[in-house]
Each structure stands twice: as structure tokens, then as C-alpha cells.
Amino acid sequence: MRFEWDEAKRQSNIRKHGIDFIGTEEVFQGKTVTILDERLDYGEERFITLGLLKGRVVVIAHTETDEVIRIISVRKATKNEETSYFKAIAD
């Protein structure tokens, strides 16, 4: 699986959330919880994945094909999201 992103969006994410897209592959190598993001009509299928990055739970918005995961944003999970993640992976 290859990872890609828009460089301007990556820089914006670093400024806004303090998290770089580089290294997010780590999240997808561990236990994850992924849901379809149906909040808006994005014109493409988008997913929200929760997983561990450097020991903390993060939320990644992304698209996915058979070969590529395109990262849209990464942020630290809220307390509720963190609780939901640990509950889901324990089941």
C-alpha cells in the first residue's frame, strides 16, 4: 500500500493540529477502527480511521483504493473518540 497527500494540506495540518502526515503508515499497521465518512457528499468515498500513532490515538480522514491511501487530515482523538477506539478494539 502506498501513501500520498497534498503537500499544501500536509503543511496546513502540521500548523493546525501539530501532526505530520509523514509516518501515518504506522497507524494502518496496527489495530484500527474505520468507518465510512457520510457527513457530507465529498464526490468520493472517504473514510475515518482511528488508530495509534506514537502511542496516542489519532483520527485520520482519508480515501482508499487497492493501491493508495490518500491522507486528507490527521488530528489527535477527542476523549470520547479515544474511549470508543479502545472499546472497539477490545471487542
Predicted regions and their residues:
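Ribonuclease/tRNase effector modules and their secretory precursors
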Residues: M1-D91
